[in-house]
Amino acid sequence: YTAKPKLDFPRIEKIHQLTGVPLVMHGGSGVSPEDYVEAIKRGVRKINYYTYMAREGTNAAKAYLKDHPDVIYYHDIACAARDAMKNDVEKAMSVFYGLKK
């Protein structure tokens, strides 16, 4: 992105009020934790979250390969990626749902 995303919170709230249906946020890359929370307060109920999680998995796989250059088992790399992705999703869920871990 060339600029930080700017969510139109009054519009989100108005759409939610007029339709009475839960809203879906497609593409949340670059959205701050505070803006996620505000969007949820205004009617967003589903957030398609992938890019940050995938990036964490990729970075973990790269780091694992760097630290273990002779690794021959894919599942070792996949486990490192999975663990990083799981950690990232847990952080996102704590923002989305206000969970304390």
Which residues does each predicted region cover?
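Active-site beta-loop-alpha junctions enriched in small/polar residues
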Residues: 26-30, 50-52
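Alpha-helical scaffolding segments of alpha/beta enzyme cores, especially the outer helices
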Residues: 10-14, 38, 87, 91
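Alpha-helix-loop-beta-strand connector modules within alpha/beta enzyme cores
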Residues: 4-25
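Glycine-rich phosphate-binding active-site loops on the catalytic face of alpha/beta enzymes
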Residues: 42-59
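Extended, intrinsically disordered, low-complexity segments
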Residues: 63-101
